[in-house]
C-alpha cells in the first residue's frame, strides 16, 4: 500500500494488478510497475556488479586502448542518456515549481537512472584504459535496460492509440529518445574495440581472434567460424592454426605449477619423515648401478612415508588452476537451476491445454518462455564447458611441463626406477586423465544438487509416493560403489600391464636391429602378446563391469518412475495419473537420469585420476640431483691454479647402495691433460659422472673452476641437422666452426653427406656410423669452448688414423684444446706417454696416480698391466712380422713408448647402425667413387637431406573401409547383433512412453481411472524388455571392442616386426610408441564407449522425431528444414574437427620423440647446462600440440551452441503447434510431444558430438592400419625352399657378382663382389670408413637385399630361403652389445631351446660364470632396460655367450671388441680362436692386430674388393692393407 502513495498522488496506481496483467486478453503492466520495477532492475544490476567488476579490472590490466570512434560514440551516448534522464528530473522539478503535485517516483526514478548512466559511462572509459575490447557486463546491462524499456514502449503506444487517453508529451518524447539511444548503445556494444597498445597480439603473425572478439562472438563462439569454413573448403594444415592465447601457453602455466609444487614439498620436508629403501644386491656392478623399475615403484608405494607427510599434488593443482576453474561453479549452478524451468513450464502448458477458457496469448507466452530459457541454458552451459576444457588443457600442459622439468633433475637412481615407458605414460595417459576429469569434477556437487531439486519437485507433484523412487536410488548406491572400487582395481592392473608393454615395445624398437640379426622377432612378439593378454584379461573384466553399469544406469530412472507411479496409483484410488502429473514427473525423471548416469562415470574418472595423481606424485617426489654438492667457480675468480680439486670424496649411484667410488682425492692444474685407465667396471666412467654431479656425494669436497664439456662413451645425437648437433645452442662463428670441423676430422664426412652439415641426422644418429657419431659428439664439446673437458673413451669408436688425427689436433699437447683442462678415460695405451698425469682406477678407488714415467718407475699395478698386454701383443707381432722380441725392462719401456699402438689400435667403429641400411651410407660409398657427383645441384641435395619422416596427418573424410575394417575386427555377427539390440531397447522405451500417454488419457469415472492394473503391468513389462536389450547390447559392444583391440594390436605388432630396417630408420620411435600407447588406448577404452553413446543418441533422435510427428503432424513442415540446417552445421563441423584431431595426433608425436631423446642424453644436457634451452623446446612442442587441440574444443562448443539452437527451435515449434492445435489434441499427447522435444536438444547435441567423436576416434584405427600396411621384408620361413636342418655343414660362403644398394634411386654401395670363403677359414674385413664393410655383413644377413648377384652358402642361394632359416644359421657378435630387460637367461636364450647346463657352459667359456654365480638370482638375474646394470664389457661377454650357445658354422664379428678394454678383448679373442676353430669366422676389424693370424683378409674400398689374400702376402704387396697396418703401428 505504501507504494501506491509513492507512485501516484491519490494512491490509485497499484504496483501489481492480476486483472490488468494476467486475467485479460490484452495484458499490460500497471504504471507504478513501469515507473519502478522496470526502471530499477537494470540500475540494481549494474550497481550490484560494479564493486566486483571494478576489483576485477584493477587486477587484470591488458594495456591501454586509444580513443576510437566506437569508444567516443559509446561515451557520448552515455552522456546523452544521462542528460535525457535528468531532463525528466528537471521537468518534474519545473512542474512542482508550478504547483503541480507529483508522486515521489517521478523524482526518484530519473535520479537513480541518471546516476546509473553516469556509472555506465565511467565504466566504458575504465574498460578502455584496462584494455577491455568488448564487455559482457555492459552488453547485459544495455540488453536488460532495453527489454524493460520495451515493455514500457508497448504500453505507451497502446495508450496513445486509445482515443480518450491522456498523453504526457514531454515525458513521452524523452522516453522515445531514451529508448533510441539504448538501442544504439546495445548495437554498438555488440562490436569489439581495437587491440590495446603494446599488446602481444600486434606482433603475432597469426593471433587467436578470441582475444579481440566481441562478447557476443565469444558467448556464441562465432569467432572460430572462419576456421571451420576454411576446414570445410579444404583440409586444415598446421599453418592455418592460430597461436595459443598467452594465458594457455606453457611459458605461463608450467612455472606456476612448479613453483607451487616446490612450496608444497618444502612444507612437507619440515615434517619428520623416515623413508625406507630396500637394500640392493651388493653383487651388482656399481659403475652404472640400475634398479629394477617395477620393484622400485612398488617399494616407493609400499614404503613411502605415512600419508599425511606426502606432498599433496591435488592441493597444488587446485591452488594453481582453482581461481579460473571456480568460474565454472557459477555457470554450473545457474544452469542447474534453469534446467528445472522446462518441466515447470510444461506443467503450465498442459494446464493451459486443459483450460479451454484461458486466453491464447498465455499459450504463446509459455512457448516463448520455454524457448528463451532453453537458449539461455545453452549459452550458460557451454560457457561452463569452455572453462572446464580450457582448465583441463592447462592442467595437461602444466603436468607435461612439470614431468619434463623433473626428468632433467632427478638422480640416476630415481631415473632407473621409472622407465622411459612409464614416464611417457605419465605425459600421455595420466596427463590426459586430469584433462578429462576437469570436465566432470563439478558433477560431484552438481549431481546431488540436481537429484535433490528433482526429488523436491517430484514430491510437490506426487507426494510421499516419490519415496518409493528414492528407495530404488538408495539401493543402487552400494551397487555403484562396489563397481567403482572394482574399476579402480582393474584400472591399476591395466596401467601396470600397459607400462610393461610400452617399456618392452620401447626396447624392441630401440634394439630392432639386434632382434633381426638374431631372428628373435617371434620370441619378443610372444613376450609382448603375453603382457597384452594380461592387459586384455583386465579389460574384459572391466567390460563386463561396464555392461552391468550401463544396465543399472539406464534402468534406474525407469525403475524409479515405475515404482513411484505404482505406489502413487495403488495407495489411493483417488490418485489419478493425469497428463500433468505423469509428464511433468517424467520430465523430472529424465533430468534425474543425467546425474544418476554421470555420477558413476565421474566416480570412475576420479578413481582413474587418483591413480594417476599417485603415480605423478611419486615421480615428482623423486630425489633430485644436488648441483650444490660440487663447488663451481668461474675462471676469473682465481682461487688457486687447480681446475679440479677433489678431497676425500665418496660417491654412490643410489643412497641405499654401497659407495661406487671411495676416498677419491686428486687435484688437476689448469691446462693439464689427464688420462684415466683401469679395467672394466673399476669406476672410470663413474669418476666423470661424479665430476658432473651425476652421482650422490656421500662425503668429501669437490671444486670445479669454469665451464664443463662432456663427451660420453656412447655418443648422443639429436634428430636435427649435423650443424645444430655441433652448435648445440651456441651462436655460429663460421671460422671457428670450420676449424672445429677440421680438427674433428669431419670435413670428408661433410663432403659425403647429401646436404653437408645441413643434412638431418636421424633419431639417435641412425644415418651416421659409430665413428661419425663420436666425432660429432666430440665436435659439439670442442665448439662449446668450455674450460674443462671430460672425454669418456671417445677414441675407441674411430679408426686408428682418425684417432691419431683427433688426438694430435684436438686432445693432445698440440691440439686445439692444449690450454684447456682435459680428462680422458681411455683403453688405448698409445697416448699415455703424451699425457701429463695418469690416474689408475681399481675397484672404485684411485690405486696409482702420476706421470707415465713415474708410474713405470714405481713398478706397481700399472707397470704390471702394461707389461702383460704389451708383451703378449708384441709376441704376436713378432710372429706375424718376423721381428725378434726385445726383452729387458728398459728396452721394454721404450718399446711401450714407441710401439704402443700394438696394444690398442684405437679401433672401434661403433655399430654403424645404419652404415648398413640407411640411404646415407649408400651415399658415403657412392660419393667416394666420383668427385664430380659432389657437384650435384644444391636443390637436389636439399631434397634429400630429410631422413626422418614426420608423422603425417591423413586428410579428408575417414574412409568407410576403416569402419568396415573395425567391424570385421569385432566380427560381423556381433556387430549386427549389437545394432539389433539397440533397436529393441529404443522401441521398448518409445512404446512404454506412448503407453503412458494413453494411460493418462483414460477417462475418469467416479473420481478414479479404470484398467489401472493392466496399464501398470504392461508399463512394467515394457521396462523389463528394455532392460534386457540394454544389457545385451552393452555386453555385445564391450566384447566386440576387446576382440577388435586384440586383432588390431596383433596385426600392428606383426606388421612392425616384419618391416625392413629401412622403415625403422626413417620412422621416429616416437611415432611408433604413439601408436602402441595413445592410439591403442583409444581403441581399447574409447571406441566401444563412443559406439554405445553414438547408437543411443541416433535412436533417441529418431524416436523423438517420430513422437513429435505423431502428436502434431503439422510439425512435418518444420522438421525437414531444421534437419537440413542440422545436417549442414554437422558436416561443416566434422570436416574441421576430424582434421584438427589428426593434426593434434600428429603434433603429439614430436612431444614424445623429444622427450625420449632428452632422457637418453640427459647427462650431456646437464653437463653443457643446456636444460633451459631443452625445456623451451619441449614447451614449444607442447604448445604446438595444444594449438591443434584448443580449436577442436572450441569447435565442439561452436557446434553445440548451433545444434542446441536447432533443438530449441524444435521445442518452440512443438509447443507452438500444441498451442495452435490445443482444441484437437489430448493433454496426454501434448505432454508426450513437448517432453520429448525438451530432450531432443540434448539428443541432437550428443548425436553430433558422438558422430564426431566416432570419426575422430576411429582415426586411431586408421593410424594403426597405416602401419599395418607398410612394406614388408621377405618371408621369415618358406616351406618349399627350407634348407636341411643340418645346413650349413661346411660353412663355405660365396659372393657371386654381388651388388648392393640401399634404395632403388641410389648407386651401388657394394659393386661386383666376387669372393669364395672356404669352410673353417678366418677372414678379416678391413677398410676405411664408408668402404662397405658393414654393408657386406648386412647383405649376408639380408638386412638389405642384393641388387644384383647372389650369395651362396654351402650350395644354397640365401635369397631363396626364409629370413629366419638364414639368420638362425649365422651368428653375429654386434658392435653395440644390446641387452633387453628380462632375465639373463632370456637374454641368452629367448626361445628356451637350451638346457641350463648348456647355458652355464656358454657362460663359463665367455668368462662370466663366476660373475653370474655370485648373483643372488643366478640365471634369473633381472637385466635393466638396455642392460644398463651391467658394464659395457660384461654386456659384450653376454653377446659372446649367446654366440657360443648358438654355435653356428658361420660367425660374424662386427668390430665387437672395439669398445672393451684390452683384458676383455683378450678373453674374447682367445675364446673365439678355441671355440670356433672349425667355423667360418668373418671379422670386421679396426684393431688390425686381432686379424693378423687370420687365414685371409679382404680389403674393401669404395664398395669394391681392392686386395684379398693372407695378411703376410698383403703386407708384402705394400698396398692399402700395408698403409693401414703402418697407421696402426704394426709395421
Curated annotation (Swiss-Prot):
Changing residue 1246 to A/F/Y: Impairs estradiol glucuronide transport. PROSITE patterns: ABC_TM1F, ABC_TRANSPORTER_1, ABC_TRANSPORTER_2. Residues 325-608, 975-1256 form the ABC transmembrane type-1 domain. ATP 2 binds at residues 1327-1334. Keywords: ATP-binding, Cell membrane, Deafness, Glycoprotein, Hydrolase, Lipid transport, Membrane, Non-syndromic deafness, Nucleotide-binding, Phosphoprotein, Repeat, Translocase, Transmembrane, Transmembrane helix, Transport. Gene3D superfamilies: ABC transporter type 1, transmembrane domain, P-loop containing nucleotide triphosphate hydrolases. Changing residue 792 to A: Only partially affects protein maturation; impairs leukotriene C4 transport. Mediates export of organic anions and drugs from the cytoplasm. Mediates ATP-dependent transport of glutathione and glutathione conjugates, leukotriene C4, estradiol-17-beta-o-glucuronide, methotrexate, antiviral drugs and other xenobiotics. Confers resistance to anticancer drugs by decreasing accumulation of drug in cells, and by mediating ATP- and GSH-dependent drug export. Hydrolyzes ATP with low efficiency. Catalyzes the export of sphingosine 1-phosphate from mast cells independently of their degranulation. This is Multidrug resistance-associated protein 1. It comes from Homo sapiens. The gene is ABCC1.
Amino acid at each position: 500500500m505504501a507504494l501506491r502513495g509513492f507512485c501516484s498522488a491519490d494512491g490509485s496506481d497499484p504496483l501489481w494488478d492480476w486483472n490488468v496483467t494476467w486475467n485479460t486478453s490484452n495484458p499490460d503492466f500497471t504504471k507504478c510497475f513501469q515507473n519502478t520495477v522496470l526502471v530499477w532492475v537494470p540500475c540494481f544490476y549494474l550497481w550490484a556488479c560494479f564493486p566486483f567488476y571494478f576489483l576485477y579490472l584493477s587486477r587484470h590490466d591488458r594495456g591501454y586502448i586509444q580513443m576510437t570512434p566506437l569508444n567516443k560514440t559509446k561515451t557520448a551516448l552515455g552522456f546523452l542518456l544521462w542528460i535525457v534522464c535528468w531532463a525528466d528530473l528537471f521537468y518534474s522539478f519545473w512542474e512542482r515549481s508550478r504547483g503541480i503535485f507529483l508522486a515521489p517516483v517521478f523524482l526518484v526514478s530519473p535520479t537513480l537512472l541518471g546516476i546509473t548512466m553516469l556509472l555506465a559511462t565511467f565504466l566504458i572509459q575504465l574498460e578502455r584504459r584496462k584494455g577491455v575490447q568488448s564487455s559482457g557486463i555492459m552488453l547485459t546491462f544495455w540488453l536488460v535496460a532495453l527489454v524493460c524499456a520495451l515493455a514500457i514502449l508497448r504500453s505507451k503506444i497502446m495508450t496513445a492509440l486509445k482515443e480518450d487517453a491522456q498523453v504526457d508529451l514531454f515525458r513521452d518524447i524523452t522516453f522515445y529518445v531514451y529508448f533510441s539511444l539504448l538501442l544504439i548503445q546495445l548495437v554498438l556494444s555488440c562490436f569489439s574495440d581495437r587491440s590495446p597498445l603494446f599488446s602481444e597480439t600486434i606482433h603475432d603473425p597469426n593471433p587467436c581472434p578470441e582475444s579481440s572478439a566481441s562478447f557476443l562472438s565469444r558467448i556464441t563462439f562465432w569467432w572460430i567460424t572462419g576456421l571451420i569454413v576454411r576446414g570445410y573448403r579444404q583440409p586444415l594444415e598446421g599453418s592455418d592454426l592460430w597461436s595459443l592465447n598467452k594465458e594457455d601457453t606453457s611459458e605461463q602455466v608450467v612455472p606456476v605449477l612448479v613453483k607451487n609444487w616446490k612450496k608444497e614439498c618444502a612444507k612437507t620436508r619440515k615434517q619428520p619423515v623416515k623413508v625406507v629403501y630396500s637394500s640392493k644386491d651388493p653383487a651388482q656392478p656399481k659403475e652404472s648401478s640400475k634398479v629394477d623399475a617395477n620393484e622400485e615403484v612398488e617399494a616407493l608405494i609400499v614404503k613411502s612415508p605415512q600419508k599425511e607427510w606426502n606432498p599433496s599434488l591435488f592441493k597444488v593443482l587446485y591452488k594453481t588452476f582453482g581461481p579460473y576453474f571456480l568460474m565454472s561453479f557459477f555457470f554450473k549452478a545457474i544452469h542447474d537451476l534453469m534446467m528445472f524451468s522446462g518441466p515447470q513450464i510444461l506443467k503450465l502448458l498442459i494446464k493451459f491445454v486443459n483450460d479451454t477458457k484461458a486466453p491464447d496469448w498465455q499459450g504463446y507466452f509459455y512457448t516463448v518462455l520455454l524457448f528463451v530459457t532453453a537458449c539461455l541454458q545453452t549459452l550458460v552451459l557451454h560457457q561452463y564447458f569452455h572453462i572446464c576444457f580450457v582448465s583441463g588443457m592447462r592442467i595437461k600442459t602444466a603436468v607435461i611441463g612439470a614431468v619434463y622439468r623433473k626428468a632433467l633433475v632427478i638422480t640416476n637412481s630415481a631415473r632407473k626406477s621409472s622407465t622411459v615407458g612409464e614416464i611417457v605414460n605419465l605425459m600421455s595417459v595420466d596427463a590426459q586423465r586430469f584433462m578429462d576429469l576437469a570436465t566432470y569434477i563439478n558433477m560431484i556437487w552438481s549431481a546431488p544438487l540436481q537429484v535433490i531439486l528433482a526429488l523436491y519437485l517430484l514430491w510437490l507433484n506426487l507426494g510421499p509416493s516419490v519415496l518409493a523412487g528414492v528407495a530404488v536410488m538408495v539401493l543402487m548406491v552400494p551397487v555403484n560403489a562396489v563397481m567403482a572400487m572394482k574399476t579402480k582395481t582393474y584400472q591399476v592392473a591395466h596401467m601396470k600391464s600397459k607400462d610393461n608393454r610400452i617399456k618392452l615395445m620401447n626396447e624392441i624398437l630401440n634394439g630392432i636391429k639386434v632382434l633381426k640379426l638374431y631372428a628373435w622377432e617371434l620370441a619378443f612378439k610372444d613376450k609382448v602378446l603375453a603382457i597384452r593378454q594380461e592387459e586384455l584379461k583386465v579389460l574384459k573384466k572391466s567390460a563386463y563391469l561396464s555392461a552391468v553399469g550401463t544396465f543399472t544406469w539406464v534402468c534406474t530412472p525407469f525403475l524409479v518412475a515405475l515404482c513411484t507411479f505404482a505406489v502413487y496409483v495403488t495407495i489411493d484410488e483417488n490418485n489419478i495419473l493425469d497428463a500433468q502429473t505423469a509428464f511433468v514427473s517424467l520430465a523430472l525423471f529424465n533430468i534425474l537420469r543425467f546425474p544418476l548416469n554421470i555420477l558413476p562415470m565421474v566416480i570412475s574418472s576420479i578413481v582413474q585420476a587418483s591413480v594417476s595423481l599417485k603415480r605423478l606424485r611419486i615421480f615428482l617426489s623423486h630425489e633430485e640431483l644436488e648441483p650444490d654438492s660440487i663447488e663451481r667457480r668461474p675462471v676469473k675468480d682465481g682461487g688457486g691454479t687447480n681446475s679440479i680439486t677433489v678431497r676425500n670424496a665418496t660417491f654412490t649411484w643410489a643412497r641405499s647402495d654401497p659407495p661406487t667410488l671411495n676416498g677419491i682425492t686428486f687435484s688437476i692444474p689448469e691446462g693439464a691433460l689427464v688420462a684415466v685407465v683401469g679395467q672394466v667396471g673399476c669406476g672410470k666412467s663413474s669418476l666423470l659422472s661424479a665430476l658432473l654431479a651425476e652421482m650422490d656425494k656421500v662425503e668429501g669436497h669437490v671444486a670445479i673452476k669454469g665451464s664443463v664439456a662432456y663427451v660420453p662413451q656412447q655418443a648422443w645425437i639429436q634428430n636435427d641437422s649435423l650443424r645444430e648437433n655441433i652448435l648445440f645452442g651456441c651462436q655460429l662463428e663460421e671460422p671457428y666452426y670450420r676449424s672445429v670441423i677440421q680438427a674433428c676430422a669431419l670435413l670428408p664426412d661433410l663432403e659425403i653427406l647429401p646436404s653437408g652439415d645441413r643434412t638431418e641426422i636421424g633419431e639417435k644418429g641412425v644415418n651416421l656410423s659409430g665413428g661419425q657419431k663420436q666425432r660429432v659428439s666430440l665436435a659439439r664439446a670442442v665448439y662449446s669452448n668450455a674450460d674443462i673437458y671430460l672425454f669418456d673413451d671417445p677414441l675407441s669408436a674411430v679408426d686408428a688414423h682418425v684417432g691419431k688425427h683427433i688426438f694430435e689436433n684436438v686432445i693432445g699437447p698440440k691440439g686445439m684444446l692444449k690450454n684447456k683442462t682435459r680428462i680422458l678415460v681411455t683403453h688405448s695405451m698409445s697416448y699415455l706417454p703424451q699425457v701429463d698425469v695418469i690416474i689408475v682406477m681399481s675397484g672404485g678407488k684411485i690405486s696409482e696416480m702420476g706421470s707415465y714415467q713415474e708410474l713405470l718407475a714405481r713398478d706397481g699395478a700399472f707397470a704390471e698391466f702394461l707389461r702383460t698386454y704389451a708383451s703378449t701383443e708384441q709376441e704376436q707381432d713378432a710372429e706375424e712380422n718376423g721381428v725378434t722380441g726385445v726383452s729387458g725392462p728398459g728396452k721394454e719401456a721404450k718399446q711401450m713408448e714407441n710401439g704402443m699402438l700394438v696394444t690398442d689400435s684405437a679401433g672401434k667403429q661403433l655399430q654403424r647402425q645404419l652404415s648398413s641400411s640407411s640411404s646415407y651410407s649408400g651415399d658415403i660409398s657412392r660419393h667416394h667413387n666420383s668427385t664430380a657427383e659432389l657437384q650435384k645441384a644444391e636443390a637436389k641435395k636439399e631434397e634429400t637431406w630429410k631422413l626422418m619422416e614426420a608423422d603425417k596427418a591423413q586428410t579428408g573424410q575417414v574412409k568407410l573401409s576403416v569402419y568396415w575394417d573395425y567391424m570385421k575386427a569385432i566380427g560381423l555377427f556381433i556387430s549386427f547383433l549389437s545394432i539389433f539390440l539397440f533397436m529393441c531397447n529404443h522401441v521398448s522405451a518409445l512404446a512404454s512412453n506412448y503407453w503412458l500417454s494413453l494411460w493418462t488419457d483414460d477417462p475418469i469415472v467416479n473420481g478414479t481411472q479404470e484398467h489401472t492394473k493392466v496399464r501398470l503391468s504392461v508399463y512394467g513389462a515394457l521396462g523389463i524388455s528394455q532392460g534386457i536389450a540394454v544389457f545385451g547390447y552393452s555386453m555385445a559392444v564391450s566384447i566386440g571392442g576387446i576382440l577388435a583391440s586384440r586383432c588390431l594390436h596383433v596385426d600392428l605388432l606383426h606388421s612392425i616386426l616384419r618391416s625392413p630396417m629401412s622403415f625403422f630408420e626413417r620412422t621416429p620411435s616416437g611415432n611408433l610408441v604413439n601408436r602402441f600407447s595413445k592410439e591403442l588406448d583409444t581403441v581399447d577404452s574409447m571406441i566401444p564407449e563412443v559406439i554405445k553413446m553414438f547408437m543411443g543418441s541416433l535412436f533417441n533422435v529418431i524416436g523423438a522425431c517420430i513422437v513429435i510427428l505423431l502428436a502434431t503432424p503439422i510439425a512435418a513442415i518444420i522438421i525437414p528444414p531444421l534437419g537440413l540446417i542440422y545436417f549442414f552445421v554437422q558436416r561443416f563441423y566434422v570436416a574441421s574437427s576430424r582434421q584438427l584431431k589428426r593434426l593434434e595426433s600428429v603434433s603429439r608425436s614430436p612431444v614424445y620423440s623429444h622427450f625420449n631423446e632428452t632422457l637418453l642424453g640427459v647427462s650431456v644436457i646437464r653437463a653443457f647446462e643446456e636444460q633451459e634451452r631443452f625445456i623451451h623446446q619441449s614447451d614449444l612442442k607442447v604448445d604446438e600440440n595444444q594449438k591443434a587441440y584448443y580449436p577442436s574444443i572450441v569447435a565442439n562448443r561452436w557446434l553445440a551452441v548451433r545444434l542446441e539452437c536447432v533443438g530449441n527451435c524444435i521445442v518452440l515449434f512443438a509447443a507452438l503447434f500444441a498451442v495452435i492445435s490445443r482444441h484437437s489434441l489430448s493433454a496426454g499427447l501434448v505432454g508426450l510431444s513437448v517432453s520429448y522435444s525438451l530432450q531432443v536438444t540434448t539428443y541432437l547435441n550428443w548425436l553430433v558430438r558422438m558422430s564426431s567423436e566416432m570419426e575422430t576416434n576411429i582415426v586411431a584405427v586408421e593410424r594403426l592400419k597405416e602401419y599395418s600396411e607398410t612394406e614388408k621384408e621377405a618371408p621369415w620361413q618358406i616351406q618349399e625352399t627350407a634348407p636341411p636342418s643340418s645346413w650349413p655343414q661346411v660353412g663355405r660362403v660365396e659372393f657371386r657378382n654381388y651388388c648392393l644398394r640401399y634404395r632403388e634411386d641410389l648407386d651401388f654401395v657394394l659393386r661386383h663382389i666376387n669372393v669364395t670363403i672356404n669352410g673353417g677359414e678366418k677372414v678379416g674385413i678391413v677398410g676405411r670408413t664408408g668402404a662397405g664393410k658393414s654393408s657386406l655383413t648386412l647383405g649376408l644377413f639380408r638386412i638389405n637385399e642384393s641388387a644384383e648377384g647372389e650369395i651362396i652358402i654351402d650350395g644354397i642361394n640365401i635369397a631363396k630361403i626364409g629370413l629366419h632359416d638364414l639368420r638362425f644359421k649365422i651368428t653375429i657378435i654386434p658392435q653395440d652389445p644390446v641387452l633387453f630387460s628380462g632375465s639373463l637367461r632370456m637374454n641368452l636364450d629367448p626361445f628356451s631351446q637350451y638346457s641350463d647346463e648348456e647355458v652355464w657352459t656358454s657362460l663359463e667359456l665367455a668368462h662370466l660364470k663366476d660373475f653370474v654365480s655370485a648373483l643372488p638370482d643366478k640365471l634369473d638375474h633381472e637385466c635393466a632396460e638396455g642392460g644398463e646394470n651391467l658394464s659395457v664389457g660384461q654386456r659384450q661377454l653376454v653377446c659372446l655367450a649367446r654366440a657360443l650357445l648358438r654355435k653356428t658354422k658361420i660367425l660374424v664379428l662386427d668390430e665387437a671388441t672395439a669398445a672393451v678394454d684390452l683384458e676383455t678383448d683378450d678373453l674374447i679373442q682367445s675364446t673365439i680362436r678355441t671355440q670356433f676353430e672349425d667355423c667360418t669366422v668373418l671379422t670386421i676389424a679396426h684393431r688390425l692386430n686381432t686379424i693378423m693370424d687370420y687365414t685371409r683378409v679382404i680389403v674393401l674400398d669404395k664398395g669394391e674388393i681392392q686386395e684379398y689374400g693372407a695378411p703376410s702376402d698383403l703386407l708384402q704387396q705394400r698396398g692399402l692393407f700395408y698403409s693401414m697396418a703402418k697407421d696402426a703401428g704394426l709395421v
